Amino acid sequence: MMRKIRGRHVRMSGVLLMTVMSACFLTGCVDQHPEGTQTTIQPTETLDSMLQITDPIEKEAVEIAKAKVHSMGAEPRIIATSPAVAEICDRLELDLVGICSSSSSVPERYEEITQVGAAMSPDMEIVSGLSPDWILSPSSLQSDLQPKYETIDTDWAFLNLRSVQGMYRSIQELGEIFDREEQAETQIKEFKDFYEAYQKEQEGKTHPRVMILMGLPGSYIIATENSYVGSLVALAGGENVYEGSTEEFLTVNTEDMKNKEPDII
């Protein structure tokens, strides 16, 4: 997560929902090699290390933000500019003064609050008129939204929704900043309990080579392990056939995909 503090930019880690790892292998999959090239799952990282926040600059940023919110003496006025961010706020029992317009359902507690426009292009006149203390947005839109936020008197944070680990780190951070540690810990524990049980069920089992193909109008892209869905596959025990890329998504030709010989698409 990245936020502005006293005119400087400070790096923080990213952010939510309970993930059903087995869905990666049970929904919308095509098994290409039912008796093929699968290998045994080997745990590579503990839950605690995955969710631990170790960056000292990041920790400092959280402490500064926490102190600033505490000094207000009142609940901060917060705007959430995407459905996912709004869901996070709901889980943390945070009140909002503004929320993005969306065709999807929003948490019941936010049904009557002011809508500020689409996630990709919020109406800054409405945003500014709500006099927010904080604006929370996904980091994928940072390059478009940050210049707009800098024109109004507010703090802002871009939440990294690119991985499950990042989501839960951000839940921890937001819980600390906005005095919602108990709610944040509830979400973390729910995830840990689920994932530890899932890992025990998968001990000694083989894991497939997976290709994550995402359809777009007129084309398609490949999701790598750096994308949110890619992190789900990794946590579920799958091996992404396009591991090693620094990008979230790739455009590749069909011949290259065929040569990867995935077990599951």
Question: Predicted regions span which residues?
Answer:
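A short, structured surface patch at a secondary-structure boundary
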Residues: 77-130, 134-140, 241
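Short helices/loops that flank or line small-molecule/ion binding pockets
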Residues: 124-131, 151-152, 252-261
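Alpha-to-beta junction loops
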Residues: 130-135, 238, 260-265
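Alpha-helical, coiled-coil/dimerization segments enriched in small aliphatic residues
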Residues: 102-106, 221-249
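Extracytoplasmic substrate-binding proteins
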Residues: 51-53, 68-77, 144-219, 239-246, ...
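Bacterial Sec-exported substrate-binding components of ABC uptake systems
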Residues: 3-17, 28-84, 182-212
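Secondary-structure junction motif
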Residues: 143-144, 230
